[in-house]
Amino acid sequence: MNNSLIVRQLGLQDYQEIWHKMQDFTDTRNAETQDEIWLVQHYPVFTQGQAGKPEHLLQRSEIPVVQSDRGGQITYHAPGQQVMYVLIDIKRHKNLNVRQLVTALEQTVVKTLAEYGIESYPKPDAPGVYVDGKKICSLGLRIRRGCSFHGLALNINMDLNPFHYINPCGYAGLEMCQLADFVNQDEADCDNVSAKLIKHFADLLGYNITTL
């Protein structure tokens, strides 16, 4: 197995632009293409997953709504949320299937939050990561030709109010939280968090990291 993992720090980006780049990357990759992680924050946007239902958008606003091809329901992205897109050739990993990749992503977040003294957990019936019943991380993937794209969105230090305009991930009344609710403001930093996410994800799947 090629165990190299390229990590790209992309900063603040338009959702649709990055989404289409992920599609192009996945459509054109071959057996020699190295797996990649894209770390990004997005301008404010609601994204509907393939299972998304219009009724879960409770209130219209100036925030655009984009119909995406990832799994899951509606969610919200904005600056102060660390998004980690995983462009992985699952076929390369002998003991990895889609469910196990989801578990690895959830455990990546659990281990990262544990470094801040936060006890978090996944739910078997609702992908993502939770703290005291509130959701801190959303997760949605798309698999094409055995390769993943999309990934996770971890709330760090953002305006959570637009989550009230939706039923997050299709769950009415689901409360959201973020790292800044539990730590000092200077600790709630996307760059610091992303470094921890990458380390734990690479450790879980046995990658060597190259940062670009």
From Swiss-Prot:
GO terms for biological process: protein modification process. It is found in: Cytoplasm. One of its GO terms (molecular function) is lipoyl(octanoyl) transferase activity. Its EC number is 2.3.1.181. SUPFAM superfamilies: Class II aaRS and biotin synthetases. GO terms for cellular component: cytoplasm. The record marks K135 as: Lowers pKa of active site Cys. In the reaction, the free carboxyl group of octanoic acid is attached via an amide linkage to the epsilon-amino group of a specific lysine residue of lipoyl domains of lipoate-dependent enzymes. Catalyzes the transfer of endogenously produced octanoic acid from octanoyl-acyl-carrier-protein onto the lipoyl domains of lipoate-dependent enzymes. Lipoyl-ACP can also act as a substrate although octanoyl-ACP is likely to be the physiological substrate. Belongs to the LipB family. This is Octanoyltransferase. It comes from Haemophilus influenzae (strain PittEE).
